[in-house]
């Protein structure tokens, strides 16, 4: 985004130089001045932040334009090796399960058969 895409209605200087009319009850000029001072500081900070972000955006776009196109042609990793630890097969798992059942249930399994 460029600064041309934003329409600014006020500048810090315009805020500083703004004159307010007083009404019947008026206002406290010191309160207005203090408030406007805060607005001016914030406005200046926002302007600096916008300029910094625009500069960073331009830099990143240029960096992206200059970066080589990367294609990922690596094969997808296989999870088969991670699923079974070394030396463990389905037979080993079934054998361990059988031993565990015998230990937990004891002879109750043999009586039910």
Swiss-Prot record:
Family matches, as HAMAP family: GpsB
Domain of life where this protein originates: Bacteria
GO cellular component: cytoplasm
InterPro entries from the UniProt entry: Cell_cycle_GpsB (IPR011229), DivIVA_domain (IPR019933), DivIVA_fam (IPR007793)
Principal location: cytoplasm
Function: Divisome component that associates with the complex late in its assembly, after the Z-ring is formed, and is dependent on DivIC and PBP2B for its recruitment to the divisome. Together with EzrA, is a key component of the system that regulates PBP1 localization during cell cycle progression. Its main role could be the removal of PBP1 from the cell pole after pole maturation is completed. Also contributes to the recruitment of PBP1 to the division complex. Not essential for septum formation.
Parts forming coiled coils: 36-68
GO BP terms, alphabetized: cell division; regulation of cell shape
Family under the similarity heading: Belongs to the GpsB family.
Protein name: Cell cycle protein GpsB
Subunit record text: Forms polymers through the coiled coil domains. Interacts with PBP1, MreC and EzrA.
Cellular compartment(s): Cytoplasm
Keywords recorded for this protein, A-Z: Cell cycle, Cell division, Cell shape, Coiled coil, Cytoplasm
Highest classification ranks of the organism: Bacteria, Bacillati, Bacillota, Bacilli, Bacillales
């Amino acid at each position: 985004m460029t600064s041309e895409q934003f329409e600014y209605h006020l500048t810090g200087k315009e805020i500083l130089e703004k004159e307010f009319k007083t009404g019947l009850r008026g206002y406290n000029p010191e309160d207005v001045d203090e408030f406007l001072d805060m607005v001016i500081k914030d406005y200046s900070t926002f302007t600096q932040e916008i300029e910094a972000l625009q500069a960073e955006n331009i830099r990143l776009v240029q960096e992206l334009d200059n970066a080589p196109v990367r294609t990922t042609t690596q094969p997808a990793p296989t999870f088969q090796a991670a699923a079974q630890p070394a030396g463990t097969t389905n037979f080993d798992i079934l054998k361990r399960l059988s031993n565990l059942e015998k230990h937990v249930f004891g002879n109750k399994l043999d009586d039910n058969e």
